From Swiss-Prot:
It is an enzyme of class 3 (hydrolase). Belongs to the phospholipase A2 family. Group I subfamily. D49 sub-subfamily. The lineage of its organism: Eukaryota, Metazoa, Chordata, Craniata, Vertebrata. Residues 20-27 form a propeptide. Expressed by the venom gland. Keywords: Calcium, Disulfide bond, Hemostasis impairing toxin, Hydrolase, Lipid degradation, Lipid metabolism, Metal-binding, Platelet aggregation inhibiting toxin, Secreted, Signal, Toxin. Residues 1-19 form the signal peptide. SMART domains: PA2c. This is Phospholipase A2 PS22.
Length: 146
């Protein structure tokens, strides 16, 4: 085997090892995004909520900076309660529909799906009812969220 072939083989192996450590994309975050769009009637893009305040986005700590951030903390706590029930809230898909008054869970028989859908619908409606303060997007969480 030529040295160049060994280098290519090594590069492929390293790439595969790196790909194996990439976590799967949570399934229900796409659904949650649709629920948010349904609740706010498309008035604000979903990505605006991904890095807002201390709790909107990955993780969370400290005191929520405003009502919208409080919605995110409540949603995080709801997901925590779902995990205590043995559910995997970020991975569950569920049935819902978008009505004139916002999103609703369909008649869901499985407890985990019903619970997580309720968490997401409550949060989406909370987001729609809370004012959005541009100054709280992409804040320095090490300074404001202790």
């Amino acid at each position: 085997m030529y040295p160049a072939h060994l280098l290519v083989l090594l590069a492929v192996c390293v790439s595969l090892l790196g790909a194996a450590s990439v976590p799967p994309q949570p399934l229900n975050l796409v659904q949650f995004g649709y629920l948010i769009q349904c609740a706010n009637h498309g008035s604000r893009a979903t990505w605006h909520y991904m890095d807002y305040g201390c709790y909107c986005g990955a993780g969370g700590s400290g005191t929520p900076v405003d009502d919208l951030d409080r919605c995110c903390k409540i949603h995080d706590d709801c997901y925590g309660d779902a995990e205590k029930k043995g559910c995997s809230p970020k991975m569950l898909a569920y049935d819902y529909y978008c009505g004139e008054n916002g999103p609703y869970c369909k008649n869901i028989k499985k407890e985990c799906q019903r619970f997580v859908c309720a968490c997401d619908v409550q949060a989406a409606k909370c987001f729609a009812g809370a004012p959005y303060n541009d100054a709280n997007w992409n804040i320095d969480t090490t300074k404001h969220c202790q």
